[in-house]
């Protein structure tokens, strides 16, 4: 497991980036080739542009940010006063599940918390749902809010939410299953599954080096 990009070890426990859930949702074998086997291929134009846009949005928010407060303070104050608060680029970590990442936006409302992940499209693919659900799980474990949590996917460009669901038992069980499977990949106690969809293989940037490609 040494040298795996993005993997951090805290008190002997592996922690991997929550964004890996998105990759696993597309193709677990792709995740395995990139992160575990450390096979390098060029980034796509979409990936490069997406990273630039994300950095610009983060910079814009930081320039406009006015009042600083902790999550705990925002949760307490919203309950007491009925105010709502918006937090961008919130770093989160779950020591229980061994995951970490940065949440695009957290909306703290008097009766609920909304965890938002910004994406370039409008389709709620399973990998995206699992990624934002993992952010919700990590937030729940770290801050233990006294209200319901909702997971939401939002179009990065027009700011319209195209998927929104209460973080319930079904989402929790679904994402925990994938988290445990990734930890098993890291520990080399299970072999990854590959996609059976040729269309995914055609879109995959690893198709020329993948020994399971159907393209």
Regions found by a protein language model. Give the residues of each.
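Short beta-strand-loop-alpha-helix junction that forms the active-site gateway
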Residues: 118-125
């Amino acid at each position: 497991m040494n040298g795996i990009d993005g993997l951090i070890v805290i008190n002997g426990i592996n922690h991997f980036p929550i964004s890996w859930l998105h990759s696993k949702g597309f193709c677990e074998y792709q995740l395995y080739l990139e992160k575990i086997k450390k096979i390098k291929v060029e980034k796509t134009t979409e990936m490069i542009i997406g990273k630039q846009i994300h950095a610009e949005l983060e910079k814009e928010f930081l320039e406009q940010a006015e009042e600083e407060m902790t999550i705990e303070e925002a949760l307490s104050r919203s309950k007491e006063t009925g105010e709502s608060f918006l937090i961008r680029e919130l770093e989160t970590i779950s020591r229980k599940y061994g995951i970490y990442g940065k949440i695009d936006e957290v909306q703290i409302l008097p009766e609920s918390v909304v965890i938002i992940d910004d994406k370039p499209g409008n389709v709620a693919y399973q990998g995206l749902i699992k990624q934002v659900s993992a952010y919700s799980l990590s937030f729940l474990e770290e801050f233990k809010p006294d209200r319901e949590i909702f997971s939401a996917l939002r179009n990065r460009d027009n700011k319209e939410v195209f998927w929104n669901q209460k973080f319930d038992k079904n989402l929790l069980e679904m994402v925990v299953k994938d988290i445990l499977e990734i930890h098993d990949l890291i520990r080399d106690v299970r072999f990854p599954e590959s996609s059976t969809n040729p269309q995914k293989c055609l879109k995959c940037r690893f198709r020329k080096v993948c020994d399971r490609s159907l393209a």
